[in-house]
Amino acid sequence: SGKIGGKEKTQDLFRYLDDSGNDYDIKAEHINDYLERHMQHRYTAKDFRTWAASWKTAARLAMVSDASEAQIKKLPKLHQEAVENSEETGFPPYIRWEGRTLKGTEGLAKLAESGKLPGEGEKERSATMLAVIDTVAADLGNTRAVCRSSYIRPMFMNDWESGVFMERWNKAKSGKRRGVELLADENTAINYMRKHEDDEFQFSKN
C-alpha cells in the first residue's frame, strides 16, 4: 500500500501481510468500526485521542504546579540530555520527569531555566499552559494549535488561566473512584469534569 500515513479517510493507517503473503490495509473506518462493535457505542479513534489530550493536559498542569523548585531546576538539563541522545539514536527526544515520560519539553525547559515555571502572572501562566500543551501535542503527533482547538477540553485551560484549576483539581483527587481500569489522573479528570461541566455550560451561555 502506498497511501500509509495520509490524512484522508481513504488513507491507510496500517498494513500487514498474512501468512500467505496477502497485503491488507487498515483505514480509520476499520478502526472505528472495530471500536463500535466491541464497545457497543459509537466511539471513534478521535474520542480516545480527545480524552488522552484532555486528561494529560490537566494532569501535567497539576504536576508542574505541584513541582518543587529543585524538581523544576532539573528540566533544562534533562531536556538537553534528551536532545543529545536523540541526535545519536535518531528517535524524538523525551525525558523522564516525576515518574512521567514527556516529549516536546523545549518550552518547559526554557521556562524552568528563566525561573518562570509555573509562573505567577497571567502572561507566565499562559506560557506554562502552552508549554504543557506542547508535550501533549507531541504525544498525539499534532501541532499545538490543532491540539488546543480540537482535542483538549476547554474547561481545563480556562480554569488554569483564571486561577481556579489547582483548587478544583485537588478536590477532584479525593472524589469517587470510577473504575479500577482508570489511571489515578484519569479518575481525577473525570471527577473534575463531572463536578464543573455544568458550571462551564452556564458560563458559556451567559
Give the location of each predicted region.
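Extended accessory and catalytic-adjacent subdomains in large enzymes
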Residues: 1-82, 96, 107-198, 202-206
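Charged, low-complexity interaction regions
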Residues: 87-96
